[in-house]
Swiss-Prot record:
Cellular component, GO annotation: cytoplasm
Binding note for cofactor: Binds 1 zinc ion per subunit.
Protein's name in the database: Threonine--tRNA ligase
EC number: 6.1.1.3
Domain TGS: 1-61
Cofactor requirement: Zn(2+)
Chain residues that bind Zn(2+): 333, 384, 509
Family named by the database record: Belongs to the class-II aminoacyl-tRNA synthetase family.
Localization annotation: Cytoplasm
Primary role: Catalyzes the attachment of threonine to tRNA(Thr) in a two-step reaction: L-threonine is first activated by ATP to form Thr-AMP and then transferred to the acceptor end of tRNA(Thr). Also edits incorrectly charged L-seryl-tRNA(Thr).
Gene Ontology molecular function: any one: tRNA binding
Record keywords: Aminoacyl-tRNA synthetase, ATP-binding, Cytoplasm, Ligase, Metal-binding, Nucleotide-binding, Protein biosynthesis, RNA-binding, tRNA-binding, Zinc
Chief place of localization: cytoplasm
């Protein structure tokens, strides 16, 4: 008998070899209808995969991220098949699923345009209706190369030749179409109910600017048209909220061709950035962290010792000083370890919490750069906690609570992923098991539901990722907690235990913002530039109706400044309606209008960005209102 243990702990028994699809049918016809793919012992699998021994099984639907990924992966093959039917001379490169859908890179002697999408989509829908079964088969290396050479697919031939000697070379067939692919896929093309092509762009083969420029067609896929409609509406809203557009309109930051991927923050942007950093420092000071600062350039040998050289060197920048090789840091952890090593530590001191707003540099290909969301230099709010093994659950639980309270201030909901050991990991099986269990215990203690993301941990340890959900439903990975047994070993760091002997501490790497620049980009889009009062670079705009009120505008502005309120004056010779509209466009939370009546009665007339005309009030009541909003960090959208 084969025992299949489901996600809820229920065990089903089968006399003979079965498949996830058969298991789904046995559970209920409704589940099978919704089923997209599966996970067998935590690894992605197809509904057609044979189960011939006891296992843990999870049936995945489109509601699961891995289910979405599988369906959209098949959608990319449907796109490729449609392209080959319509344009047989086109050459296929790669076509993966991505977060928002899928793409396929194509080499053709003509340019694809969005006007051609309707024709391609029509062929894709035809392929879906044909209900073509997806069949997997394998070939030896030489046969695989010969097979793709016969099909005149040079990019596939190159991919096969670059695979390791012992690699399994698999293909997927749907009707007349065959593609080189590792899978997994859905059972048939009919599972992909709704498709839409979104855009076309240039993409260098293998992301290398020295290679040929291909054409990348982007698309997305769903199981319901209503979900596609919601997605299109979200994209339209996202365009309005684009942080690059709003950042320029509000004079927060710019990007320049003199420094691609290196943001320039303007005065108002620095106000916002410093407000976030001040809040971060306030929270971390209360939580017992000590702030440090470490150099951005360190000797290359350090990065060999840390393991970053072997795992991260392609993303690093290098320089020479006095003929010695140095690297610009891509991460803050080695510097924090050197600070820890500067002193002998007792077990009584642990945990030691060292926090740093560190400027890091990571090389990104030019095509991947995107405003503040994908840059080449950014400030990362790292903290490193050095502790005993017995303190793991308690300390990680404390970090989870800190991150939870932090995100709530900005009005974010979030979900949590546990990422496990990757293929290029360092360390023993025992250490990885202990580290992973430490994170699981803390998540359970916090009563947090989490998704397991197999094989996506850091090279030195498993991690917990926090994915923020913004007000239009998009998710952004920001906070991370990583448990590390490897770095303490590599740097030979110790503490003196109660027995007077040296012991190895456990190290936790964690961030809350992640990249502060990226977090600002997320906030701009989350609030559509209309920051809550406590974060607004300009909190109040004071404006006159005629020149006779300029002196009173100056006096009111000074009182507000003395109260710590960020204020600007608008005494231009413009109509008051124009000034109010402009302040609204600049997303200023409050506007004060000064006319003859206000001067005569010693009051101010107040307009709120959100509530409109608030009427007249005295300056003291208005200052109290602003200070209360700032103190309470009200963040309603």
């Amino acid at each position: 008998m084969i025992k299949v243990t489901l996600k809820d702990g229920k065990v089903m028994e089968f006399e003979n070899t079965t498949t996830p699809g058969d298991v789904a049918k046995a559970i209920s016809p409704g589940l099978y209808k919704k089923a997209i793919s599966a996970k067998i012992n935590g690894k992605r699998a197809e509904l057609m995969t044979n189960i011939d021994k006891d296992c843990n099984l999870e049936i995945l639907t489109f509601d699961d991220e891995d289910g979405k990924w599988t369906l959209r992966h098949t959608a990319s093959h449907i796109l490729a098949q449609a392209i080959k039917r319509l344009y047989p001379e086109a050459k296929l490169a790669i076509g993966p699923a991505i977060d928002s859908g899928f793409y396929y890179d194509i080499d053709a002697d003509f340019s694809f345009t969005e006007e051609m999408f309707a024709k391609i989509e029509k062929e894709m829908n035809k392929i879906i209706k044909e209900n073509l079964k997806l069949e997997r088969f394998e070939l030896p290396r030489e046969k695989a190369i010969e097979y793709m050479e016969e099909k005149k697919e040079p990019y596939k031939v190159e991919l096969i030749k670059d695979l390791p000697e012992d690699a399994v070379i698999s293909f997927y067939k749907q009707g007349e179409f065959v593609d080189l692919c590792a899978g997994p896929h859905v059972e048939s093309t009919a599972k992909v109910k709704v498709i839409k092509l979104m855009s076309v762009a240039g993409a260098y083969w293998r992301g290398n600017e020295k290679n040929k420029m291909l054409q990348r067609i982007y698309g997305t896929a769903f199981t319901k048209k209503a979900d596609l409609d919601d997605y299109i509406n979200m994209l339209e809203e996202a365009k309005k909220r684009d942080h690059r557009k709003i950042g320029k309109e509000l004079d927060l930051f710019t990007m320049h061709e003199e420094g691609p991927g290196f943001p320039f923050f303007h005065p108002k942007g620095m106000v916002l950035k410093n407000l976030l950093l001040n809040y971060w420092r306030e929270v971390h000071d209360k939580a017992g962290y000590d702030e440090i600062s470490t150099p951005i350039i360190l000797n290359e040998a350090l990065w060999h010792q840390s393991g970053h050289w072997d795992h991260y060197k392609e993303n690093m920048y290098f320089t020479k000083i006095d003929e010695a090789d140095y690297a610009i840091k891509p991460m803050n952890c080695p510097g924090s370890i050197l600070v820890y090593k500067d002193n002998i530590h007792s077990y009584r001191e642990l945990p030691i919490k060292l926090a740093e707003i560190g400027l890091v540099h990571r090389h990104e290909k030019s095509g991947a750069l995107h405003g503040l969301m994908r840059v080449r230099c950014f400030n990362q709010d790292d903290a490193h906690i050095f502790m005993t093994k017995e303190q793991i659950t308690e300390e990680i639980l404390g970090v989870i609570k800190l991150i939870d309270s932090f995100y709530k201030v900005f009005g974010f909901e979030y979900y949590v992923e546990l990422s496990t050991r990757p293929e290029d990991s360092m360390g023993s099986d025992e250490d990885w098991e202990a580290a992973t269990n430490g994170l699981i215990n803390a998540l359970n203690a916090a009563n947090l539901e989490y998704i397991v993301n197999e094989g996506d941990g850091a090279f030195y340890g498993p991690k917990i990722d926090f994915h923020l959900k913004d007000c239009i439903g998009r998710t952004w990975q920001c906070g991370t907690i990583q448990l590390d047994f490897q770095m303490p070993e590599r740097f030979d760091i110790n503490y003196i235990g109660a027995d007077g002997e040296k012991h190895r501490p456990v190290m936790v790497h964690r961030v809350v913002f992640g990249s502060i620049e990226r977090f600002i980009g997320i906030l701009i889009e989350h609030y559509a530039g209309a920051f809550p009062t406590w974060l607004a670079p300009v909190q109040v705009k004071v404006m006159n109706i005629t020149d006779s009120q300029v002196e009173y505008v100056d006096a009111i502005s000074e009182k507000l400044k003395e109260a710590g309120i960020r204020v600007e004056k608008d005494v231009r010779n413009e109509k008051i309606g124009y000034k109010i509209r402009e302040a609204q466009l600049k997303k200023v939370p409050y506007m004060i209008v000064i006319g003859d009546k206000e001067i005569k009665e010693g009051i101010i007339s107040v307009r709120s960005r959100k509530e409109g005309d608030l009427g007249s009030m005295n300056i003291e009541d208005f200052i109290f209102r602003i200070n209360a909003e700032v103190k309470e960090k009200i963040s309603s959208i």
